[in-house]
Amino acid sequence: MNILYVPLDERPCNAIYPEQTAAVNQTMNVLSVPQALLGNKKKPANIYGIRSFIKKNIVNCSYAIISTEMLLYGGLLPSRLHHLTEADLNKYEVFLRGIKKEFPDKKIFLSNLIMRTPKYNSSDEEPDYYEQYGEAIFRYGWLKDKAARDTLDEREESEWNQLKETLPKDVIFDYETRRAFNVQVNLLHVQLVAENIVSFVSVPQDDSAPYGYTAMDQSKVYSEIANKRLKDRIMVYPGADEVGFTLLARAYNDHLGKTPSLFVRYSATFGAQIVPLYEDRPINESLKAHVLAAGFRLVDDVKDAEFVLEYNTPGKKMQESWDQLATKDVTYDSYRHLLSFVLEIQADLAVGKKVGICDAAFANGGEMELIELLDEKGILEEILSYKAWNTNCNSLGSSLAGLAFCQATFNKEKVKENLLANIYEDLFYQAIIRKQITDNVLPEKGLNYFYLGDKADEISGLVVSLIQKYHRFTLKNSFIDDVFTIDQVTFPWNRMFEICCTVKNKES
């Protein structure tokens, strides 16, 4: 089975890791766009080169998984910066219709984000004016939406009037014009699904909030989906960078003609009801959407489940991962009994269940205590998938994919490679090492979180040594045979936010 794959952007979470996760399965092959055609951060990809790649290679594939951000705009960040016209949108539509006409038996799965609205001043991933006006733009959209749907109090009314006076008109015009175009693209996809040109569309929302530009856009898209009665083929939910994982899992389950049964076990009593950082709804509501999007079905009894997703959540309040080292909220212990959770995982494994862990107790990284307990019980290497990166839904979507590919025949050594690589990056790097280096090393070298200059190789070497240190201190009963080694650690976009960390088996 071959799947053609066009990623959201060139970062490993989109262009490398989904394919690596799928590679554990020995019955499927992912044909990805060559790296040379992809862009670099704000520099757009070679859009027409990618379209040629699709036309040339789709003939040998059963499914085409395509990111609209890549195919139309040239990547995720270019989708927030573009000045495309109706003519560009028409060419995009003609291309998709032409592919379906020429290859009617191919299933096209699209992803298309609802554009985010960050609440802070930074132009790192946004237009240049976001460096000065980002927070104000967020508040402008929030108050504009709330005024239309609800009531502003006196303080909000005053702030709203002040923003209308102080925010440059050309900034608002540019921002709102781009958002309107992007919503037009979302609505085009609704029509293409209605006509069966596209089989399925995933519409993740990045950094959601109850009010604001993203909520306004979401409402327009929701309404059109409902009007055309397409909620089973176009799904809107929180997420972004996990969408490649999700659609690969959906394609594989669709190919098998299966909706695998999944039981979800939460680590905390209130875990399902917690609204995570950077998201707009309870964890359990996002879970329902991601399960359907990936092609699974939920069951209420673990005995009926082929897979068990062990969902590590906060007890009551979610913090950032680096807070666990010094300022962990007491409710992580008083509202959650982590040892009981680990013993339940051990029991699931003992009866032969296929188990994956979505570690969403903290935002932007994993929980050290969980991994230590799994290691102490000697069950860490039995886990099929461990994900704990960025947002709750990033971890959730990729966790489901990690389980989906462990159907039929799968390579257990590759599963272990991925497991260890995720522990290295999601736990050791994101939760611990990243902040240590940002606070203690970068300033003395004249560097910062967003820019590593010409010192990326030097910082990479330090990261590798620290990962190895935390491996020795943390994994006392797991991965102790020295079979696996770090293949590489690099910095996408030359910044500290994420790394590309790959692990290889020295004996293969």
Where are these regions (language model features)?
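An N-terminal assembly and electron-transfer interface module characteristic of large anaerobic redox
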Residues: 1-508
